[in-house]
């Protein structure tokens, strides 16, 4: 720990945390690298081989393993799958990624900043290799799409 604050009940296991704040009951590590400027909320997780820089992580959000989250805001109760990267640098400028609350991101994703993923978002169709997903079509809202037991 270097110039870091760790709140009560938080656990930091075999990790480097520098210039960051770790919220109550957060779980960090093992082998997490937190560069300066991170703010992790309560009951968050930054797991094995996760690197973070200037990330703001909402309460209950999990980044369990093998991910880079830099210059990003993640909402509350969001889950980031392994191998997810927020690509924040275009060779000249740093850009920001925002991922909302209650978002479930699968494994192996690349978010090329600047980009925003809204609350509760899901990509529901296959995406071919070497493709980019974006939408300029009419948005369809499916209210109550989660099963009752999951709400």
Pin down the residues of each PLM region.
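Glycine-rich hexapeptide-repeat left-handed beta-helix
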Residues: 3-5, 12-151
């Amino acid at each position: 720990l270097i110039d870091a604050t760790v709140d009560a009940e938080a656990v930091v296991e075999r990790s480097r945390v520098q210039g960051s704040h770790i919220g109550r009951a957060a779980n960090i590590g093992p082998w997490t690298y937190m560069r300066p400027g991170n703010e992790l909320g309560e009951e968050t997780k930054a797991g094995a081989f996760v690197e973070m820089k200037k990330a703001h992580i909402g309460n209950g959000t999990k980044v369990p393993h093998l991910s880079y989250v830099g210059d990003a805001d993640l909402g509350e109760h969001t889950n980031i799958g392994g191998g997810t990267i927020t690509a924040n640098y275009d060779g000249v400028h740093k850009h920001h990624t925002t991922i909302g609350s209650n978002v479930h991101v699968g494994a192996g994703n690349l978010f090329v900043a600047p980009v925003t993923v809204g609350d509760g978002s899901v990509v529901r169709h296959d995406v071919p290799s070497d493709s980019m997903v974006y939408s300029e079509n009419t948005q369809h809202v499916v209210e109550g799409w989660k099963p009752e037991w999951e709400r």
